[in-house]
A protein has these predicted regions:
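FAD-site-proximal beta/loop scaffold in flavoenzymes
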Residues: 66-82, 166-223
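Glycine/serine-rich phosphate-binding loop and adjoining beta1-alpha1 elements at the start
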Residues: 10, 26-29, 33-36, 40-68
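Conserved N-terminal Rossmann-fold NAD(P)-binding element of oxidoreductases
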Residues: 51, 88-89
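Core beta-strand elements of the Rossmann-like FAD/NAD(P) dinucleotide-binding domain
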Residues: 38-48, 162-171, 209
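Rossmann-like dinucleotide-binding cores of NAD(P)H-dependent redox enzymes
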Residues: 1-9, 76-77, 82-86, 92-163, ...
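A conserved short coil-to-beta-strand element within the FAD-binding core of flavoproteins
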Residues: 18-32, 58, 142-155
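Acidic/polar residues in short coil/turn loops that connect beta-strands
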Residues: 28, 38, 154, 163, ...
Length: 223
């Protein structure tokens, strides 16, 4: 990851792209207010503005991110391989992490609320994955409704359910999808609209309700 960041930084310099480290929020007249990482702020204005703040992992109430509870973002920063991992969410990303950590030697449990993992896939395809996971000794718990979690004296985390026995693990990975990250876009004084699911509303050319302001990527609802 660090290598990719350095590579992209070098690429922006070679293309003479100016970048700011901070959080930008859109104001009226295509003005972006930037709260920079060093505590200062600055404003810039563009003839056209593109909103591309992406998405963030969804979380569950009662599972604060930090320490042994992490999302697909934090798990990439692990410096050691956990002995026991519980993955909440049996979708594509959750299954990818399950397979990877099982191959690395972790004891893995997938926790899925639906009747089967990979609920959006053809059952025949999902069954192939289930059989493969059985060979890797990955435990799959479907129809499991998570109730909460608690820290144990030995530092492990116990996950409880409304049905069934608890699961004890060293790391919990939340993998229940992502949501658009429009939280800090500002938008005061603009005609940019956000729908009830958090997506920025755009037309077929990705233009928002504000002229010459566009939104792209995970920030908009795509087929």
């Amino acid at each position: 990851v660090e290598g990719l960041v350095k590579g992209l930084t070098g690429l922006t310099k070679s293309k003479k792209v100016t970048y700011f480290l901070g959080t930008g929020s859109l104001e009226a007249n295509r003005t972006v207010n930037i709260a920079q990482a060093d505590g200062t702020s600055t404003k810039i204005q563009g003839a056209k503005v593109i909103l591309a703040s992406g998405s963030v992992p969804r979380t569950i109430k009662g599972f604060p991110i930090g320490g042994s509870i992490m999302t697909s973002d934090e798990v990439l920063m692990l410096s050691t391989i956990p002995k026991r991992i519980a993955i909440i969410g049996g979708g594509a990303i959750g299954c990818e992490f399950a397979s990877t950590f099982a191959d690395l030697g972790s004891t893995v449990t997938i926790i899925e609320g639906a009747p089967k993992i990979l609920p959006g896939l053809d059952p025949d395809v999902a069954n192939v994955v289930v059989k493969t996971f059985a060979k890797k000794q990955i435990t799959i718990r479907t129809g499991a409704v998570v109730a909460g979690q608690s820290k144990q004296p030995d530092g492990s985390t116990q996950i409880t359910f409304t049905n069934g026995d608890p699961v004890v693990c060293d790391v919990v990975i939340m993998s229940i999808g992502r949501r658009p990250f429009a939280d800090e876009l500002g938008l005061k004084g603009t005609a940019v609209k956000v729908d009830d699911r958090g997506f920025v509303v755009v037309d077929n050319l990705c233009q928002t309700g504000e002229p010459n302001v566009y939104a792209i990527g995970d920030l908009i609802n795509t087929p």
